[in-house]
Amino acid sequence: MSSIYTLSYDKETNQIIRTVKEIFSKNINNNKELSVLIDKYFIPQELEKKSNAEVSTPFKLRQEMLDKMPIEFWTTPKKVFEPCSGKGGFVIDIIDRFMIGLKEKIPDEKERYKIIVEDCLYFSDINPTNIFICKLLIDPYNKYNLHYNEGDTLDLVIKDKWNIDEFDAVIGNPPYNSSGNTGTGNTIWQNFTKKSLNKWLKSNGYLVFVHPPGWRKPNTEKGKYY
């Protein structure tokens, strides 16, 4: 089946690639600057918004969400899944949290970074362009064994894909529905929530999502899902 998504290697894209590689080469732990760069340059295109309800999650909101997790979470290697990675905002933020949290346990920056991206981080997206960008941001020189899925995350079986059973945390901003218009299309955010709670997440794990508030209210229709 042909994809509606294509990779466009135009002059602007090549400049972004050069910029990302330059930032990365200057400081392997410069993840906050990379994260801000995502907000500035990697904005979902109209096709991505309409076909897959893709939206950017602002840097400030991402930080507020991650701040709600215990600081201690990041002080030991754990498995974290971003199921709708988009252009990589949460992915880079997760790396940054681990880089800070694991500093005492793993003082060497390069060793720490390798452990994080190879043992702690997992991500998925339906859009191959997004996967390309995430891989570029994380590993511009193809040095690491990354764990990613290119395809519909709701069809993903993590045991088959990565030979793991559960994650310590699932973090992201799942699409609200199957189109970019909240008034049309089938709502799918609850499918990401259900699968996170029932299939992906440890019983004592953390689910950190942007979502409508209804599913937390048992007396609402959405709340009946749970």
Give each language-model segment a name.
Residues 1-226:
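SAM-dependent methyltransferase catalytic region
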